[in-house]
């Protein structure tokens, strides 16, 4: 669960308007290249409307917090520019596809398996090993930048399959 010290979804709703969400969810990771209104509305509808998008945004903010904390641990601070760009891009794709909650859940159960239950979890296999965010969250133990692995093989807006993270 997202700790209360991080804030609440209700607090986010008071700070962020539907217009803000529309722009954020229909633009690229740099806030540029916004989709035309009709196409943008299709994105909003596909994600379940604004009630659902507020939840996605809240989860995305916490995921971003955890990912950047992990990035600093793995790559040092200040982050190298290429790492920051990869993390920012991946987080945007995860958010606009509606998957931040999935990554929070997987991160939580991998951490619990390793640290609390003594369950052996593999270092990462399959296309999820191409995610810098998964590496920063501790889901995988393989640095995709070191091995030039592609995030887009794992998750991209043109791929209709749900993300699949192999944990064995």
Language model segments and positions:
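Phosphodiester-processing cores and adjacent nucleic acid-binding clamps
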Residues: 1-168
């Amino acid at each position: 669960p997202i700790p209360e010290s991080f804030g609440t979804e209700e607090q986010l709703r008071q700070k962020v308007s539907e217009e803000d969400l529309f722009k954020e969810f229909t633009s690229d990771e740099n806030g540029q290249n916004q989709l035309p209104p009709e196409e943008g509305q299709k994105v909003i509808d596909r994600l379940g409307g604004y009630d659902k998008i507020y939840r996605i945004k809240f989860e995305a903010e916490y995921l971003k917090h955890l990912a950047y904390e992990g990035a600093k641990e793995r790559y040092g601070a200040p982050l190298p520019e290429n790492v920051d760009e990869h993390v920012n891009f991946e987080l945007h794709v995860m958010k606009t596809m509606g998957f931040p909650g999935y990554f929070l859940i997987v991160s939580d159960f991998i951490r619990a398996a390793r640290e609390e239950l003594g369950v052996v979890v593999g270092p990462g296999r399959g296309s999820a090993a191409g995610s810098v965010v998964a590496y920063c969250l501790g889901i995988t133990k393989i640095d995709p930048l070191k091995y030039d692995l592609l995030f887009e093989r794992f998750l991209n807006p043109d791929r209709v399959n749900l993300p699949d993270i192999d944990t064995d």
